[in-house]
Design a protein with these regions (language model features):
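Cytosolic nucleotide-utilizing catalytic cores of signal-transduction proteins
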Residues: 1-152
Length: 152
């Protein structure tokens, strides 16, 4: 039904006071609306909440994007496939929650199991969840995974 496929999204731009920034904020909002449309997300959204995905979409097909995809994401996906594990799900939960305890609870696993899996992720990718720059790298990996899964 065509009626069910309609997306109605509105984006709220961050506040600004300089008139010359209208174009910048308009373009940012349009990019976020395009992203929401591709994700089939309706409603009123703040542009700032979607900027990381919007920014990453502009980096698609760059050497940096492909490097993260091949050195982290592809390796973890291959490991999960080969051993029927859930390292990517665990990583996503750990990055999303406020604490490892909350992430373990969300995954219905013991905290030591979560720590073991984070160690396994480090072994496979050479990225340490407990090091800020590596954690950022791992977050980009999860964002790329979602973009690839959603075919954005």
């Amino acid at each position: 039904n065509k009626e069910q496929n309609k997306i109605a999204a509105a984006v709220i731009s961050p506040e600004f006071t300089e008139l010359e920034r209208i174009k910048e904020h308009y373009e940012m909002s349009v990019n976020v609306i395009r992203l929401l449309y591709k994700l089939h997300i309706s409603g009123v959204r703040k542009a700032e909440e979607w900027l990381p995905f919007s920014l990453l979409m502009h980096c698609r097909n760059t050497s940096e994007y492909n490097f993260i995809k091949t050195t982290v994401l592809d390796k973890l996906q291959e490991y999960d496939r080969r051993y029927q594990s859930s390292l990517l799900d665990t990583l996503s939960a750990a990055l999303r929650e406020n604490s490892l305890e909350d992430a373990a609870e969300r995954q219905h696993i013991h905290i030591n199991t979560l720590r073991y899996r984070l160690g396994k992720i480090k072994e496979i990718t050479q990225k340490n969840y407990f090091k800020m720059t590596d954690r950022y790298f791992l977050l980009l990996c999860i964002m790329i995974q979602r973009m690839e899964h959603e075919q954005l």
